[in-house]
Amino acid sequence: MKRIFVQNRELVVPGTLLAQGPYKNGRGTFREGSRIYSTVIGLVDIKGNTIRVIPLEGPYIPEVGDNVIGKIVDVKFSSWVVDIGAPYPANLKIQDFTDEKIDLLRTDLRKFFDIGDIIYAKVKAITEVNNIDLTTKGMPFNGGPLKGGQIVKITPSRVPRVIGRGGSMINMIKKLTMTRIIVGQNGWIWVSGKNDALEKLAIEAILKIDKESHTRGLTDRIKALLLSRLQELKEKGVIEEIPKLEEEPQGEDEVNGNDGEARGA
C-alpha cells in the first residue's frame, strides 16, 4: 500500500511514521521494511517521491538541487573551496563555473572569484564521503560574486517561512524595503539595499521571521513592522514615499503552511 501519513511542512518528532510504500527516504529519515520514519525533530519536506525531514536546529545538511549562498574560503589550482554553512566545505570546480576553455597554467582563478567573495550556486552532487560539488551554471548573475550588501544567517528549516506562499512574504519585504534579496536554502540570505536604513529594515524583518516562524499571524505582524518603520523613515526624510503593495499578501495563519522555495532576487 502506498500512503503518506503526514502533510508537507508538518512538524514531526523522531519515530513519526511518515509514509509507506515505494517512496525514497531522504535526510532525517530511516526505512524499516516498507515504512519510512523520522529520525529528527523537524519539518517534513515532500518533493515528488522523496520524503525528508529538515531539522529545526543544527547545521545545514545539503541536498542535490539546493540553491545556496556561499563564501569563497580558498582558491586552488582548478577549483574554489566554498563555505555554505554545512558540516563539510563545498567545492566549485572550474568546469562547473564556465564552459569556456581556461588555461589553468596561465590563469589565476582569483580573477573570477577571490577569497571572501559571496556566490550563489546550486548543489550539483554529494558523494558518499560528503564531498559537496557546486555549480554556478545557469544561476542568476552567473553565480556572482554578489557585490555589496550583507549576509544574514537564519535556521535553514525556516527558509520557507521567509519566502512564504508563492513568494508572498519575501516579495512583500523586497517591495516595501526596496532591497535586492537572494535566499539560499542553506539559510544564508544576501540583502542589498538602496541605503543602510532600508537594508537594516529588511534584515530586521527577516530575523523576526526566523525568531517567530512557528507562530500564527506572522505575515500581518511583519507587514505592520515594515509600515511602522517606513513611516518613521519618511518622517526623518530618509525616504520620500512609502511603497504601495500591488496585492495584499495572503495571511499565513497555518503554523506550518508554507510551500515556498528558495529562488533568486
UniProtKB/Swiss-Prot annotation:
Q: Which UniProt keywords apply?
A: Cytoplasm, Exosome, RNA-binding
Keyword Translocase annotated:
no
Gene assigned in the entry: rrp4
Region of interest: Disordered: 241-265
Q: Which organism is it from?
A: Pyrococcus abyssi (strain GE5 / Orsay)
On whether Cytoplasm is a keyword of this UniProt record, the answer is yes
What is this protein called in UniProt? Exosome complex component Rrp4
Q: Quote any Pfam family the record assigns.
A: ECR1_N_2
Self-association and partners = Component of the archaeal exosome complex. Forms a trimer of Rrp4 and/or Csl4 subunits. The trimer associates with a hexameric ring-like arrangement composed of 3 Rrp41-Rrp42 heterodimers.
